[in-house]
Protein backbone atom coordinates (compact mmCIF):
# COMPACT_ATOMS: atom_id res chain seq x y z
CA UNK A 1 0.00 0.00 0.00
CA UNK A 2 1.37 3.40 -0.99
CA UNK A 3 2.00 5.64 2.02
CA UNK A 4 1.00 9.30 1.60
CA UNK A 5 1.82 12.11 4.02
CA UNK A 6 -0.90 14.76 3.73
CA UNK A 7 0.18 18.12 5.14
CA UNK A 8 -2.56 20.74 5.53
CA UNK A 9 -3.84 22.96 8.33
CA UNK A 10 -7.40 23.02 6.88
CA UNK A 11 -8.96 20.30 9.04
CA UNK A 12 -12.14 19.84 7.01
CA UNK A 13 -10.39 19.80 3.63
CA UNK A 14 -7.69 17.51 4.96
CA UNK A 15 -10.23 15.06 6.39
CA UNK A 16 -12.18 14.94 3.13
CA UNK A 17 -9.08 14.43 0.97
CA UNK A 18 -7.70 11.85 3.40
CA UNK A 19 -10.90 9.78 3.27
CA UNK A 20 -10.94 9.85 -0.53
CA UNK A 21 -7.30 8.79 -0.72
CA UNK A 22 -7.93 5.89 1.69
CA UNK A 23 -10.86 4.75 -0.48
CA UNK A 24 -8.45 4.71 -3.45
CA UNK A 25 -6.11 2.38 -1.58
CA UNK A 26 -3.57 4.74 -0.03
CA UNK A 27 -2.35 4.68 3.56
CA UNK A 28 -2.60 8.30 4.76
CA UNK A 29 -0.67 10.04 7.54
CA UNK A 30 -1.64 13.63 8.39
CA UNK A 31 0.44 16.58 9.61
CA UNK A 32 -0.87 20.12 10.18
CA UNK A 33 2.29 22.23 9.85
CA UNK A 34 5.72 22.15 8.27
CA UNK A 35 7.54 21.07 11.42
CA UNK A 36 5.17 18.12 11.91
CA UNK A 37 5.61 17.27 8.22
CA UNK A 38 9.38 16.92 8.62
CA UNK A 39 8.98 14.78 11.76
CA UNK A 40 6.33 12.57 10.12
CA UNK A 41 8.42 12.18 6.95
CA UNK A 42 11.38 10.96 9.03
CA UNK A 43 9.24 8.63 11.15
CA UNK A 44 6.80 7.26 8.54
CA UNK A 45 8.94 7.22 5.35
CA UNK A 46 6.09 8.06 2.93
CA UNK A 47 6.45 7.48 -0.80
CA UNK A 48 4.66 10.74 -1.55
CA UNK A 49 3.95 13.97 0.33
CA UNK A 50 1.02 16.26 -0.50
CA UNK A 51 2.28 19.56 0.92
CA UNK A 52 0.13 22.65 1.40
CA UNK A 53 2.47 25.57 0.89
CA UNK A 54 0.73 27.98 3.33
CA UNK A 55 1.19 26.41 6.76
CA UNK A 56 1.67 27.63 10.33
CA UNK A 57 4.91 27.14 12.30
CA UNK A 58 6.93 26.42 9.12
CA UNK A 59 5.53 26.94 5.62
CA UNK A 60 5.45 24.25 2.96
CA UNK A 61 8.23 25.85 0.94
CA UNK A 62 10.70 25.60 3.83
CA UNK A 63 9.46 22.17 4.95
CA UNK A 64 9.94 20.82 1.42
CA UNK A 65 13.50 22.19 1.29
CA UNK A 66 14.27 20.48 4.62
CA UNK A 67 12.72 17.17 3.51
CA UNK A 68 14.59 17.19 0.20
CA UNK A 69 17.93 18.05 1.85
CA UNK A 70 17.71 15.27 4.47
CA UNK A 71 19.21 11.89 3.50
CA UNK A 72 16.46 10.12 5.48
CA UNK A 73 13.59 11.79 3.60
CA UNK A 74 14.83 13.06 0.23
CA UNK A 75 13.47 9.98 -1.58
CA UNK A 76 9.87 11.02 -0.95
CA UNK A 77 8.16 12.74 -3.87
CA UNK A 78 6.41 16.02 -3.03
CA UNK A 79 3.38 17.57 -4.69
CA UNK A 80 2.98 21.18 -3.59
CA UNK A 81 -0.61 22.37 -3.07
CA UNK A 82 -1.75 25.97 -2.85
CA UNK A 83 -4.87 28.10 -3.10
CA UNK A 84 -2.64 30.91 -4.36
CA UNK A 85 -2.39 31.40 -8.09
CA UNK A 86 0.43 33.91 -8.13
CA UNK A 87 2.79 34.00 -11.07
CA UNK A 88 5.99 32.18 -10.20
CA UNK A 89 4.56 29.89 -7.51
CA UNK A 90 5.01 26.76 -9.66
CA UNK A 91 8.65 27.70 -10.27
CA UNK A 92 9.11 28.47 -6.56
CA UNK A 93 7.71 25.00 -5.74
CA UNK A 94 10.13 23.36 -8.18
CA UNK A 95 13.03 25.32 -6.68
CA UNK A 96 12.00 24.14 -3.18
CA UNK A 97 12.13 20.52 -4.38
CA UNK A 98 8.52 19.76 -5.31
CA UNK A 99 8.08 17.11 -8.00
CA UNK A 100 4.77 18.66 -9.07
CA UNK A 101 2.37 21.41 -8.06
CA UNK A 102 -1.41 21.74 -8.01
CA UNK A 103 -3.90 24.50 -7.27
CA UNK A 104 -6.69 24.27 -4.70
CA UNK A 105 -9.52 23.47 -4.74
CA UNK A 106 -8.17 20.04 -5.57
CA UNK A 107 -9.60 18.18 -8.53
CA UNK A 108 -9.28 14.69 -7.04
CA UNK A 109 -8.90 12.64 -10.23
CA UNK A 110 -6.24 15.04 -11.55
CA UNK A 111 -4.35 14.79 -8.23
CA UNK A 112 -4.48 10.98 -8.29
CA UNK A 113 -3.21 11.10 -11.88
CA UNK A 114 -0.25 13.19 -10.74
CA UNK A 115 0.45 10.74 -7.90
CA UNK A 116 0.29 7.77 -10.28
CA UNK A 117 2.57 9.50 -12.79
CA UNK A 118 5.12 10.43 -10.14
CA UNK A 119 5.15 7.00 -8.57
CA UNK A 120 5.10 5.22 -11.92
CA UNK A 121 2.00 3.29 -11.01
CA UNK A 122 -0.28 2.08 -13.78
CA UNK A 123 -3.30 1.98 -11.50
CA UNK A 124 -3.99 2.22 -7.80
CA UNK A 125 -6.51 -0.42 -6.82
CA UNK A 126 -9.70 0.52 -4.99
CA UNK A 127 -10.08 -1.40 -1.74
Question: Which residues make up each language-model segment?
Answer:
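Short hydrophobic/Thr-rich beta-strand motif most characteristic of the beta2 strand and flanking loop
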Residues: 25-32, 40
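Charged docking surfaces used in two-component/phosphorelay signaling
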Residues: 15-23
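C-terminal output helix
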Residues: 94, 106-115
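Active-site beta3 strand of CheY-like receiver
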Residues: 44-50, 55
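Residue-level signal for the "D+5" position in two-component response regulator receiver
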Residues: 30, 55-58, 87
